[in-house]
């Protein structure tokens, strides 16, 4: 990327190597997660980063201010599972209140949305993406290793009830699992959901595992 200026009075902005203006940034709040999905993390022995090894919330806010001054208008918070990070709601509020920021969104597994959805909306969160790879309860437990399907469904319902728009569901497609994609399509018939299927990428420790 490179830095330019469309107008001295409007500050700097960033472009990629193809000349496209960059106005979007993803920020990972934590490497911690309350699931251990088979394509993402080992079942046991996961060593999380120490708090001293990740950016503090104040440092993230500083990054956002600098990025916004360079033309970044849209921010997405991810993880790990971002809602396990203490202070996530306050961070959403700080980003939303930063001059130049138009949109704050979140990618989550949905487990903590029933608890935090209303607070997040009040803080300025606009929309959410919820990761959900199957609608079969047994398969859900197999994929996440420690979750229950109703937790994710409750998260989706909480997001819809709170008024996030849009609410997107992300499903990673894994060949060996034989997921029922028609069930996902049916779920969107009576719910205003955006459904996205994401191709599994066999990288790192998950490459070749579970017959993927």
What kind of region is each of these model predictions?
Residues 81:
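Conserved G/P- and acidic residue-centered "switch" motifs that form tight phosphate/ATP-binding loops
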Residues 45-50, 114, 136-143, 204-209:
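A short acidic, helix-capping loop that chelates divalent metal ions and anchors anionic groups
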Residues 17-57, 69-70:
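Canonical Radical SAM [4Fe-4S] cluster-binding loop centered on the CxxxCxxC motif
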Residues 54-76, 84-189, 194:
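Radical SAM/AdoMet-radical enzyme domain recognition
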Residues 175-178, 196-212:
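Flexible glycine/acidic-rich beta-alpha junction loops that bind and position SAM and/or redox cofactors
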């Amino acid at each position: 990327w490179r830095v330019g200026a469309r107008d001295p009075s409007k500050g700097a902005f960033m472009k990629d190597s193809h000349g496209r203006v960059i106005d979007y940034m993803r920020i990972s709040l934590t490497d911690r997660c309350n699931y251990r999905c088979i394509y993402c993390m080992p079942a046991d022995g996961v060593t999380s980063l120490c708090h001293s090894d990740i950016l503090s919330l104040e440092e993230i806010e500083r990054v956002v201010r600098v990025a916004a001054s360079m033309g970044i208008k849209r921010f997405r918070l991810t993880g790990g599972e971002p809602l396990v990070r203490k202070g996530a709601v306050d961070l959403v509020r700080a980003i939303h209140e930063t001059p130049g920021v138009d949109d704050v969104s979140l990618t989550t597994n949905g487990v903590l949305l029933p608890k935090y959805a209303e607070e997040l909306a009040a803080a300025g969160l606009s929309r959410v993406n919820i990761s959900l790879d199957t609608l079969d309860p047994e398969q859900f437990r197999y994929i996440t290793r420690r979750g229950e399907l109703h937790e994710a469904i409750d998260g989706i319902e909480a997001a819809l009830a709170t008024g996030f728009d849009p609410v997107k569901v992300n499903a990673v497609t894994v060949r060996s699992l034989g997921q029922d994609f028609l069930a996902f399509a049916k779920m969107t018939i009576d719910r205003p959901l955006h459904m996205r299927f994401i191709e599994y990428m066999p990288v790192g420790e998950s490459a070749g595992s579970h017959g993927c």
